[in-house]
């Protein structure tokens, strides 16, 4: 059964500053603001620009981009939490702890990206995140973010 997205691409573009070729979330399947959790999806295709060099004979999605996909999914939830401040503030990915890569991600895979925040404050947040292909965990870790005023980045 195919899951209908609750947030499609057009709305994602309002929630994330990323654009092609660096937009690594295709849709949001579900989110819960009370539980501070989100489930999103990235469809991995052979047309991804990183497959040109990583690796042409055996294409594998770079682990760092799997982590970036997780950070973007979590960033969508922060964008929803910020709501009215979204145009003034930006969530910046600060770091990752306890990152583990458990399975290669290849063209044709569908990455399910889930994140749950243990902390969201006016300064930032922390979330546990996991990327899966089917029922297999591909990568996981603990993400941290800073919330900054966009004007401070000028």
From Swiss-Prot:
Organism of provenance: Chlamydia caviae (strain ATCC VR-813 / DSM 19441 / 03DC25 / GPIC) (Chlamydophila caviae)
Record localization: Cytoplasm
Sorted UniProt keywords: Cytoplasm, Lipid A biosynthesis, Lipid biosynthesis, Lipid metabolism, Lyase
Main location: cytoplasm
Gene: fabZ
EC number(s) given by UniProt: 4.2.1.59
InterPro entries reported for this sequence: FabA_FabZ (IPR013114), FabZ (IPR010084), HotDog_dom_sf (IPR029069)
CDD domains documented for this protein: FabZ
GO MF: (3R)-hydroxyacyl-[acyl-carrier-protein] dehydratase activity
Top-rank taxon: Bacteria
Catalytic activity: a (3R)-hydroxyacyl-[ACP] = a (2E)-enoyl-[ACP] + H2O
Function of the protein: Involved in unsaturated fatty acids biosynthesis. Catalyzes the dehydration of short chain beta-hydroxyacyl-ACPs and long chain saturated and unsaturated beta-hydroxyacyl-ACPs.
GO CC annotation terms, alphabetical: cytoplasm; membrane
Protein name: 3-hydroxyacyl-[acyl-carrier-protein] dehydratase FabZ
């Amino acid at each position: 059964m195919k899951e209908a997205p609750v947030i499609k691409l057009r709305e994602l573009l309002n929630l994330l500053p990323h654009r092609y070729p660096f937009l690594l979330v295709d849709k949001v399947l579900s989110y819960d603001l009370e539980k501070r959790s989100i489930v999103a999806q990235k469809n991995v295709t052979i047309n991804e620009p990183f497959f040109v060099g990583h690796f042409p004979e055996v294409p594998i999605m770079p682990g760092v981009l799997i982590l970036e996909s997780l950070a973007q999914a979590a960033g969508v939830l922060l964008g929803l939490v910020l709501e009215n401040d979204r145009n003034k503030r930006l969530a910046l990915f600060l770091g990752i702890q306890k990152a583990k890569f458990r399975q290669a991600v290849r063209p044709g895979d569908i990455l399910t990206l889930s994140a749950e925040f243990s902390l969201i404050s006016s300064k930032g947040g922390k979330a546990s995140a996991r990327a899966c292909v089917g029922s297999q965990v591909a990568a996981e870790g603990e993400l941290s973010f800073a919330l900054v005023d966009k004007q401070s980045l000028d």
